[in-house]
């Protein structure tokens, strides 16, 4: 009788462990991007394995939600940067995520877009004034670096050169 009970208990424990293992392997496959879906662990047993499965399932669902949230922001970032590449600087990232690093990246991209759009608008404004024969205003070079600084200096030099020609 003891041997039969031991065998039955062993089978139940081994079966529960195998179910738990399969669920974890499915989750790790999802985390490692080997699978696009994640399966929850079987939490139907009324023992410690069922309790552990419930805790793990809660965390799988939280992690899955977070990963999907991150993917949506990454997809939106790719789309927005594709528009930037074509010259549309009005685009911004709008999705909010719980991942602090991705939120910081979102803010950096949006701030960069704001700054570049403002600087390009400043250049266009001055060029529009030049086309109306008004060469008095200049582009501020404060806080500009490299290419934007060269662009602003180039436009300012153009205005100075035209003014010198007219004098």
Where are these regions (language model features)?
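Polar/charged heptad-repeat coiled-coil helices used as signal-transmission/dimerization stalks
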Residues: 4-167
């Amino acid at each position: 009788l003891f041997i039969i009970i031991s065998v039955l208990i062993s089978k139940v424990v081994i079966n529960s462990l195998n179910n738990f293992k399969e669920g974890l392997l499915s989750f790790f496959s999802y985390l490692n991007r080997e699978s696009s879906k994640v399966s929850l662990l079987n939490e139907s047993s009324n023992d410690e394995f069922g309790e552990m499965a419930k805790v793990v399932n809660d965390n799988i669902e939280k992690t899955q939600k977070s990963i999907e949230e991150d993917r949506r922001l990454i997809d939106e970032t790719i789309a927005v940067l594709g528009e930037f590449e074509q010259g549309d600087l009005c685009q911004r990232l709008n999705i909010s995520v719980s991942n602090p690093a991705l939120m910081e990246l979102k803010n950096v991209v949006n701030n960069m877009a704001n700054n570049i759009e403002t600087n390009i608008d400043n250049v266009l404004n001055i060029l529009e004034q030049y086309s109306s024969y008004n060469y008095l205003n200049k582009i501020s070079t404060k806080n500009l670096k490299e290419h934007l600084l060269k662009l602003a200096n180039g436009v300012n030099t153009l205005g100075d050169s035209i003014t010198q020609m007219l004098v």
